[in-house]
Amino acid sequence: MNSQDSTVMADLQAIRANYSLTSEQRQIVDHVDRVSREVLHPLQARMDAEDWWPDDLFKQMGELGLLGITAPEEMGGSGQNEFTQALVSEVISKWNPAVGLSHGAHDNLCLNNLLRNGSEEQVKKYVPGLCSGDLVGALGLTEPGAGSDALGSMATTARRDGDDYIINGSKIYITNGPIADVVLLYAKTDKSKGAKGISAFIIETDNPGFKVAQKLDKMGFRGSPTGELVFDECRVPASAMVGAENSGVSVVMSGLDLERAMVTSVCVGMAERALELGLEYAKIREQFGKPIASFQMVQSKLAEIYTEVETARAFSYRALAACVGLPKGAGGRGEIHKLTAAACLYAGEAFN
């Protein structure tokens, strides 16, 4: 890392300090920044070119302390809050966006939901492995042909058969799907009730009847494995149900606002890196005998980008702070719902 990079990093650390991060949070950010720059960033070019995911990467992330940020320390986690988890996501995404995306699906969509809604037995069974990286997590909600009515139009079913449920259906665009060991899955247990007849299950992917139908080829976030999952008479024990029967919507909504807010951290991290690269290029690219950074038009454009990045960061941090300690059942409506949706919209558009 050259002195120019060091100066940029110091400036960004100062910006984060102004958001009143604790000393522990600053230490975590510094650690994640270092290991992401040294370990994850060198993988990015090959991951993008070959749509490649290193087989042992989740275990390596577990060893580096990048997983289970919100999980209890006695289960191998870090015992931090959701805001700190978002800081980790932001920094990882800055240095390797594909890893940032897969990290979010694992640590937030799967692990956080399990911590929030799982039984004591389910948490003890799966969370330690998710923290160590011995297990890779995913979430299965979206289905082929589903639009904004993903819950009401859900076709995947789970029918009771004695002490088991038998699952049939498919899920599409599932981040980590091709490599997942456990999937938090939503399926209809009572088709007559529409969205109110959905239940959540934690599915082990070595179950007979489960298969990855295809790994999808994407334009962006290449390397992060995304796939179609198929369940064909997939039998799971009733103990795999997360929450009560037909309460899947409450499981979905319990994490929706946090999930939206977490997306903003991915956008902010990527936008921050894009700004850094733009600044570096403007300083070394010369026209008419001087760096283009000295031209007022270029300076103006960079100033606009900087303003958008920092506005997105402020919006992101505000939304994330509002999600910390949100009581179960308080999400999915009202001010928090509006705030996280707006933050997600702004951060995504600012990054683009």
PLM region spans:
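Alpha-helical interface subdomain recognition
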Residues: 1-95, 99, 105, 117-122, ...
